[in-house]
Amino acid sequence: KNFFVNNKRNLIVGFSIILFLIIGYLSLKEIEKREKIKLANQFNSIKINFKVENKQSTIEQLKKLVNQKDATYSPLALYFLIDNKLTDDKNEINILFDELINKTSLDEEIKNLIIYKKALFNSDVITENDLLKILSPIINSDSIWKSHSLYLMAEYFYSKEENQKAKEFFNKIILLPDANNDIIVESKKRLNRDFSE
């Protein structure tokens, strides 16, 4: 009892600080929740109101949404931009990909998916070295997207008629312990059909 009487002031200050921290934390979570709802509404509004006539406005709104660096709606905005072929400017799209990859806080596998999509988006116009550079974070990891990335490289070399390199990548897929089953099947088919001796 004496302890409480003697330290009454310190206990009140300590309790007040703890209460203030709890209220601050809960307030921050509520603000984040409201911001997420706002971004969701903004994205849905862009999708619903999209018309070819207001294409430039849609592009600007989607770019703004990508730059919000939200783990959910920023990638969705970029995918909407690409899927609807709203811009032919590959450089602009690559800048947005880099914004997501380098500046947005993402789950590691979501980040790897975005890297893979960037490589896929660019695969018909870039060099072997550039494609490998984009995909190297995935290829040099245990990502679930590793087999997809190896398959993209194999198909890239196959399309360039660099059959030995293509064969090497198809073989790497087959040897992967956690490779996607469909990709293993396709790789085996390709090896049996086009590379059997």
Show the residue positions of the predicted features:
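Soluble extracytoplasmic domains of inner/organellar membrane proteins
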Residues: 78, 85, 96-197
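Short extracytoplasmic/periplasmic juxtamembrane "stem" segments immediately C-terminal to an N-terminal membrane anchor
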Residues: 39-57
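Transmembrane signal-anchor/signal-peptide helices with a preference for the extracytoplasmic
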Residues: 21-41
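Extracytoplasmic/periplasmic/luminal assembly and interaction segments
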Residues: 55-105
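N-terminal positive-inside, membrane-proximal cytosolic segments immediately preceding the first
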Residues: 1-20
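TPR-repeat structural position
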Residues: 36, 55-56, 90-91, 128, ...
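Short coil/turn and helix-start
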Residues: 33, 52, 87-91, 106, ...
